[in-house]
Amino acid sequence: MTSPLLISLASCLVAVNQASLIGRCDLAKVLHQEDLDGFEGYSLTDWLCLAFVESDFNITKVNENTDGSFDYGIFQINSHYWCNDYQSRTENNCQVDCQELLSPNLLAIINCAKKIVSGAGGMKNWVKWRLHCAGRPLSYWMTGCHLA
């Protein structure tokens, strides 16, 4: 579902010095627009906390792991299991090129994250979410954000 909000958000990100950071409330709006609030039992605050602890809201973050795989994008999705980086062995369960997970419109990474969360373990698949977000009060992540 491509929306005018996603298109305008992508335009803003590209226009500001090729910025790769997205604001917390802007991300909340996109996630809400893409129906992630309540998806598989996780709230927008879970998704915001995940994005912060994994990437500090950096859409284009890439991190190399000790096993030679890479983590991509705002949710740091791993190339060994979820996307094809053409560098390391991959299962490519999301059937997507890893570079697409760095796109400012966020659709590819949101769709892949939904697939991950829909499977066994849900958000527990992200170690940093388990350590820093799970079971904690997270309502402050939405402070000052207006979704309408």
Swiss-Prot record:
GO terms for molecular function: lysozyme activity. InterPro entries: Glyco_hydro_22, Glyco_hydro_22_CS, Glyco_hydro_22_lys, Lysozyme-like_dom_sf. Disulfide bonds join C25-C145, C49-C133, C83-C98, C94-C112. It comes from the Eukaryota. SUPFAM superfamilies: Lysozyme-like. One of its GO terms (biological process) is fusion of sperm to egg plasma membrane involved in single fertilization. Gene3D superfamilies: 1.10.530.10. CDD domains: LYZ_C. Monomer. This is Lysozyme-like protein 6.
